[in-house]
């Protein structure tokens, strides 16, 4: 498994875009390519869509609970468990290459519990 962290513009810290990172890393014998941390599902979606369209590797998607906001010098994540679960529900339905999904910064057990409900409901459907 290889993960990269992208900003809201789909770029890594030194400016590499997701397309270049994926093209390089996917040829190194990895089984799964992933995006984690740094952004929420909304900002991550264009990169997830592009990766899904490649249909070459299974995907790991682990966004934050939205973009962090600075409040008194502290990073605060305001995406509710329900809103995040709804966004990830759409990801699971639309992007079939996703094999691993979860939450990173700003998530808590309630975020994961709501995501679990979404996954369980999709299994029933």
Whereabouts are the PLM-identified features?
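Domain-level signal for soluble alpha/beta catalytic cores
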Residues: 1-125
């Amino acid at each position: 498994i290889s993960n990269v962290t992208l900003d809201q513009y789909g770029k890594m810290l030194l400016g590499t875009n997701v397309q270049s990172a994926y093209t390089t890393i996917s040829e190194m014998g990895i089984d799964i390519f992933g995006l984690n941390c740094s952004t929420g599902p909304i900002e991550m979606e264009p990169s997830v869509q592009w990766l899904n369209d490649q249909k070459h590797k299974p995907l790991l998607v682990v966004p934050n609970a939205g973009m962090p906001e600075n409040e008194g010098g502290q990073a605060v994540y305001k995406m509710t468990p329900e809103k995040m679960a709804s966004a990830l529900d759409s990801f699971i339905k639309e992007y079939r290459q996703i094999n691993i999904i979860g939450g990173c910064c700003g998530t808590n057990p309630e975020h994961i519990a709501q995501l679990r409900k979404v996954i369980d409901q999709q299994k029933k459907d």
